């Protein structure tokens, strides 16, 4: 009880010393962090929603995206070129992984692809360590995106605003693709009932291939965007993977809309907790997940019994 009282007094003291502007800036920082979570989680949800594959290698694709960007820049490329090249290259790698490793495991239950991608993630991380070393590298923010901009409540890093904007563009493009194209219609129908899609004469294996490629491409893009914020290290994918699984569980397994809402919510919760109680920042993610699962076990937009 005494410790709880001391903790409450410390928290009250911190809150008393905070201005509205500082809280608002921290909220924007949470949105920028949440944007990275969103990009990572929508790829994870897209793959699970269509393929029913829990891709434990998703964090490794995220990490590869950061390293590919770093390598391209070392060859004389620039960040703007990387924004296009990285998702393309990582997506092509994802296509190869699906075609060669994952496709033979379809129809064998959820466990086999899970174990395979779990092992694949370790292989990918070790390959990066052998190729680039165990230590990390800084990733310079593009010169045009350095500095801060006045957003009314204070100055906010321009690059973080760019991350929020880039995420919004990707979400819009993905929505247009899924809602306004015939292939997007097939993907949405296949996520609900693959058998119906097969009856219509659609090559489901080709659809799964493209979906896996898109999901991994988005993960690589997220890794590239995160690189200037946190640097590039082989373990960066494992860190976000645990947090992103919380996002997908809270949002609902396989739900892209849920991943967007939950990603932003988790980012804001982590950011605000870091302001008021820094030692509880990481714990707050799992506390949020526990609360959501108690109230709604399938998450915000998940379907009951999806994992059965």
For the regions a language model picked out, list residue spans one by one.
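Membrane-interfacial amphipathic/re-entrant helices at transmembrane-helix boundaries
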Residues: 1-39, 68, 79-82, 108-113, ...
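Cytosolic-side transmembrane-helix boundaries in multi-pass membrane proteins
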Residues: 2-14, 22, 100, 131, ...
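Membrane-embedded helix boundary and interhelical linker motif in transport proteins
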Residues: 28, 50-96, 100, 272
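Short, non-helical or kinked segments that cap or interrupt transmembrane helices
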Residues: 35, 44-66, 107-112, 183-186, ...
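Alpha-helical transmembrane segments within multi-pass membrane transporters and channels
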Residues: 77-121, 127, 261-266, 296-297
């Amino acid at each position: 009880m005494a410790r709880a009282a001391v903790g409450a007094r410390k928290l009250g003291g911190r809150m008393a010393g905070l201005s509205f502007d500082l809280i608002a800036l921290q909220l924007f920082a949470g949105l920028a962090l949440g944007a990275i979570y969103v990009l990572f989680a929508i790829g994870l949800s897209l793959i699970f929603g269509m393929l029913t594959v829990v891709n434990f290698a998703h964090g490794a694709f995220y990490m590869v995206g950061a390293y590919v960007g770093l390598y391209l820049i070392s060859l004389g490329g620039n960040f703007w070129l990387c924004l296009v090249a990285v998702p393309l290259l990582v997506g092509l790698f994802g296509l190869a992984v699906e075609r060669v490793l994952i496709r033979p495991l379809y129809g064998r239950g959820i466990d086999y692809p899970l174990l395979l991608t779990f092992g694949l993630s370790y292989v990918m991380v070790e390959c990066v360590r052998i190729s680039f070393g165990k230590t990390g590298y800084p990733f310079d923010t593009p010169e045009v995106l350095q500095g801060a901009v006045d957003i009314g409540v204070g100055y906010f890093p321009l690059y973080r605003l760019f991350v929020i904007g880039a995420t919004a563009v990707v979400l819009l493009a993905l929505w247009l693709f899924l809602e306004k194209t015939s292939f997007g219609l097939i993907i949405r129908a296949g996520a609900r009932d693959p058998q119906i899609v097969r009856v219509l004469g659609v090559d489901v294996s080709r659809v799964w291939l493209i979906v896996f490629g898109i999901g991994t491409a988005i993960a690589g893009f997220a890794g590239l965007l995160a690189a200037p914020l946190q640097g590039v290290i082989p373990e960066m994918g494992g860190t976000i993977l645990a947090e992103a699984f919380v996002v997908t569980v809270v949002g609902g397994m396989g739900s892209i809309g849920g991943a967007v809402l939950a990603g932003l919510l988790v980012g804001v919760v982590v950011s605000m907790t870091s302001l008021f109680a820094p030692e509880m920042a990481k714990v707050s993610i799992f506390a949020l997940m526990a609360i959501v699962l108690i109230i709604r076990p399938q998450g915000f937009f998940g379907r009951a019994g999806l994992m059965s």
